[in-house]
Design a protein with these regions (language model features):
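Ligand-binding clefts of soluble mixed alpha/beta catalytic domains
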Residues: 1-478
Length: 478
C-alpha cells in the first residue's frame, strides 16, 4: 500500500504501477538548512517521491518529482534520494523509472546541490547496461537535468507541457522560441534522437508499462519470456507488399501482431523496436522508405537510402540489445547512403558506429533481406560478413553492388538504349540475383515472404545457446 501523500507526483506513480503496489522510501527526508534556505517553508519528501512497486508483477523502482514543492528543484537531499533508489535497484537488479517535472538545481543550496546531483550521473552510468532506465518528462527538464534522460535507455516527453533542453530556446544564438521551440516535445523527438515517444500523460505511462513488460529486468535476467499463444508456423499474409513500410512487416511477424517502436519520429528511414517471437523479446532494426497512417494514406520517407540519423539510431539500439542479451532481427531493404550535404557531415561516423554495433554484438543476430540490398549499405546492415549468424532472403530480393541499370550505364558508357537494357537484364540475373548470393554462401536460405515468421523463430530457437569468444579488451573506441 502506498504511503505517498496525494499529489500530482504521487498520482503519476499510482497510474504507472499495478494497483496498491507502491511502497515509498524516504518519505520523512527534507531539505537540509543552508545559509539561503527558506527554512520556514515545508518541503515534504524534498520535492521527490521515491520507492518501488510492480508493473505486471515485475519489480521496478520509481522516483517522481513534485513541482509543487520548491518548484521540484533538485537539492542535496532530493538528489541523494534518487541516488539511493539507484543503489537499491542495482543490488536487486530491477529497472529504474524517473518521472521528471523539475525547475532545475536549487539555487539556495549551491555546491551542495551540485555535488549531490553529480551522484545521480554516476549512479546512472554505473547502471547503464545493467538495469533498464526509463525517463518520462512531464514538465520542465532543463540545464543539467537534461543530461539525466540522455543517460537513460528510453525517454518519453509529454506533448504539451514537457520541456527538454540544456539551453532554453531564447538563449540560443540567433533564435527565439517563436522561431524554433527547441525545447518542445516535437523538436526533441524529431531532431535529437533522445526521445522515444511523445503523447499525453496517460499515453506515456501506458507506453512505459508496455515497454517494461517487454524488457528483461536486468542484464542477467534469463526468465523474461511470455507464453506464446500465436501459431509459430503462421503464414504472414500480404507481407510481401510491406518492403517499404517494414513496421507493418514486423507486426505481421510478431506474436499476436504486437510491435513496440522506439524513436519513431527520428531517423525515420530506419525502424527500431521490440517484438516477441515464441514468447521471447527480440530487438528489430529495419530499413523503411514509406509509411502508412491509420487510414491507409502513404507517406514517402526516403528513396531507399540510409541516412546518418538512421544509422546512429540503429547503432544505439543494437548496443542496448547486446547489453541486455536481447537477440537482434534485421529486415534489409537499402540501396545506398543518403546523398545530401547535411547527411555527409555525419555519414561516415554514424555508419561506422552502426557497423561496430552489429559486429561487436554477441547476441543471436538474424538478417532477412526483404528487398533491394546494394553496396556497402547492405554490408553495414547486419550482413553475413559483419557477423549475422543467419541470413535469409525473400525469393524476390536482390543483393549486389548497385542497381543493374546504373551498372550497365557505367560499364557500357555510350551504348544505345537497347544494348543498355539487354546488359542491365544480364547484370541483374548474374550479379544481383538472389540465387547468386546464395550460391556464394552470403544467404543461408531463400524463403517465401509469407514464411518469414516460422524461419526467424526457428533460427532464434537454434541460436538460443549461442556463445562467442572475442579478443580480450577493456572496450571498443568507436
Amino acid at each position: 500500500m502506498s504511503n505517498a501523500t496525494q499529489s500530482v507526483a504521487a498520482a503519476r506513480i499510482d497510474s504507472l504501477l499495478d494497483a496498491n503496489s507502491f511502497v515509498e522510501i524516504g518519505q520523512a527526508v527534507t531539505a537540509r538548512a543552508t545559509d539561503f534556505n527558506m527554512t520556514e517553508k515545508k518541503a515534504p519528501s524534498d520535492g521527490v517521491i521515491t520507492g518501488y512497486g510492480v508493473i505486471d508483477g515485475s519489480l521496478v523502482y520509481v522516483y517522481s518529482q513534485d513541482a509543487s514543492v520548491l518548484n521540484g528543484t533538485v537539492g542535496e537531499m532530493h538528489a541523494k534520494k534518487i541516488a539511493k533508489i539507484y543503489d537499491l535497484a542495482l543490488k536487486v537488479g530491477a529497472p529504474v523509472i524517473g518521472l521528471v517535472d523539475c525547475a532545475g538545481l536549487r539555487l539556495q543550496e549551491a555546491t551542495d546541490a551540485l555535488e549531490a546531483f553529480g551522484e545521480i550521473y554516476l549512479k546512472q552510468t554505473l547502471a547503464s547496461g545493467v538495469i533498464p532506465q526509463i525517463t518520462a518528462v512531464f514538465g520542465t527538464c532543463g540545464g543539467g537535468m537534461a543530461v539525466v534522460p540522455a543517460l537513460t535507455d528510453f525517454t518519453f516527453v509529454e506533448e504539451k507541457k514537457g520541456r527538454l533542453f540544456v539551453n532554453t530556446p531564447n538563449a540560443l544564438e540567433g533564435n527565439r522560441v517563436e522561431k524554433c521551440d527547441s525545447a518542445s516535445a516535437q523538436f526533441q523527438s524529431e531532431e535529437t534522437g533522445l526521445v522515444d515517444g511523445i503523447g499525453t500523460e496517460e499515453e506515456i505511462l501506458g507506453q512505459i508499462r508496455t515497454l517494461v513488460s517487454m524488457l528483461p529486468e536486468n542484464n542477467e535476467d534469463n526468465d523474461s519470456f511470455k507464453e506464446c499463444t500465436d501459431d509459430l508456423n503462421r503464414v504472414c499474409d500480404d507481407i510481401a507488399g510491406c518492403t517499404g513500410d517494414t513496421a507493418i512487416a514486423l507486426s505481421k511477424i510478431a506474436d499476436n501482431g504486437e510491435f513496440f517502436e522506439t524513436k519513431a519520429a527520428y531517423g525515420q528511414d530506419v525502424i527500431t523496436g521490440f517484438l516477441r517471437l515464441n514468447g521471447a523479446t527480440v530487438g528489430a532494426v529495419a530499413n523503411r522508405s514509406e509509411s502508412y497512417d491509420a487510414d491507409g494514406n502513404k507517406t514517402e520517407i526516403s528513396d531507399g537510402t540510409l541516412s546518418a540519423r538512421g544509422a546512429r539510431k540503429a547503432a544505439d539500439f543494437v548496443k542496448f540489445c547486446d547489453a541486455f542479451e536481447i537477440p537482434v532481427l534485421t529486415l534489409t531493404n537499402v540501396t545506398g547512403f543518403k546523398a545530401t550535404l547535411c547527411n555527409e557531415k555525419m555519414m561516415a561516423k554514424s555508419v561506422g558506429e552502426m557497423v561496430h554495433a552489429f559486429a561487436s554484438a554477441t547476441v543471436p543476430k538474424v538478417n532477412v533481406v526483404v528487398g533491394k540490398a546494394y553496396g556497402t549499405a547492405y554490408v553495414a546492415m547486419n550482413s553475413k560478413s559483419v557477423g549475422a549468424d543467419m541470413v535469409y532472403a525473400w525469393d524476390t530480393a536482390e543483393i549486389g553492388m548497385m542497381d543493374a541499370s546504373l551498372a550497365a550505364k557505367i560499364m557500357y558508357e555510350g551504348a544505345d538504349a537497347s544494348t543498355l537494357n539487354e546488359k542491365a537484364a544480364e547484370y541483374k540475373e548474374l550479379q544481383n540475383g538472389i540465387a547468386s548470393a546464395a550460391a556464394r554462401g552470403y544467404v543461408d536460405t531463400v524463403i517465401k515472404a509469407e514464411d518469414t515468421r516460422k524461419y526467424v523463430i526457428g533460427a532464434f530457437e537454434m541460436l538460443f545457446t549461442k556463445r562467442e569468444d572475442r579478443p580480450s579488451k577493456k572496450h571498443g573506441t568507436v
